[in-house]
Amino acid sequence: MSFFRVAVMLAAMTGLFLAVGYLIGGQSGMVIAFLVAGGMNLFAYWNSDKMVLRMHNAREVDERSAPDLYGIVRQLTQRGGLPMPKVYVIDTPQPNAFATGRNPQNAAVAATTGLMRALTPQELAGVMAHELAHVRHHDTLTMTLTATLAGAISMLANFAFFFGGNRDNNNPLGAVGMIVMMILAPLAAMMVQMAISRTAEYRADRGGAEICGQPLWLASALEKIERAARGIENPSAEQNPATAHLFIINPLNGHRMDNLFTTHPSTANRVAKLRALASGDLAQPRPQRGPWG
């Protein structure tokens, strides 16, 4: 993701903070909101990855505690010429994964226990290669910042609703604006997720296939994860829906309404593109020796 795109998204988030601040306390509230937004943007840049990992109760693992997963990630980073990220595991039966971090030097990848149980070593390698492609493309900064700030906007809107806001009778926007903001803020959070270009997922699919050298590994994994995500809930994702776009497959897919605001391309389309890669650009055999067999 480009620096320009990051700047535009942060500016949009700041604008929403200012609007809510004005509704809460007029011009004084807007100034306070501006200061808070500036501090929050800086805090999110340095700490949003930690916050997202904490939201999902992720625990860091190493070569001793998760040798298979750690070994796969290490081998893939060597293939891709990337620094070794921190590796995390999330205790949930839904198979899924995501990457986070402001740059490749400060990146983290997370896999669920359900993912490690459901996939073959080859499929797991395909998924982790996809996440490392996000790291390589610097998608993780934008994805993590928007997840953190979208959640913050919703919380601030709830604060405005429950604690009154600007009751100045000379301000006709007060009561009406408060109601509008209460309704629009959650929608804005979902729209931010959709603003992350779906082309980033396609690009990470291709990048992951190039890193591991086997597009069909990821194609098979996506099909398995898609089926499981519709039948197994992800409690931490349900509690933090603004982070849904971080995952390789929408963790909220078990609910029909979530499909109206889907943050991911069609899994069928992604699989079709990967199969085309397998018979086209990446059809030549690649070395397969590694922790996956």
Curated annotation (Swiss-Prot):
Q: Name one GO cellular component term.
A: plasma membrane
Q: What is the membrane topology here?
A: Multi-pass membrane protein
Q: Report the EC number(s), separated by commas if there are several.
A: 3.4.24.-
Per UniProt, the cofactor note for this protein states: Binds 1 zinc ion per subunit.
Residues reported in the UniProt entry to bind Zn(2+): 130, 134, 201
Q: Where in the cell is it found?
A: Cell inner membrane
Classification via CDD domains: M48B_HtpX_like
InterPro entries assigned: HtpX_protease, Pept_M48_protease_HtpX, Peptidase_M48
What Pfam families does this protein map onto? Answer: Peptidase_M48
HAMAP family tied to this protein: Pept_M48_protease_HtpX
Q: What is this protein identified as?
A: Protease HtpX homolog
Origin organism is Rhodospirillum rubrum (strain ATCC 11170 / ATH 1.1.1 / DSM 467 / LMG 4362 / NCIMB 8255 / S1)
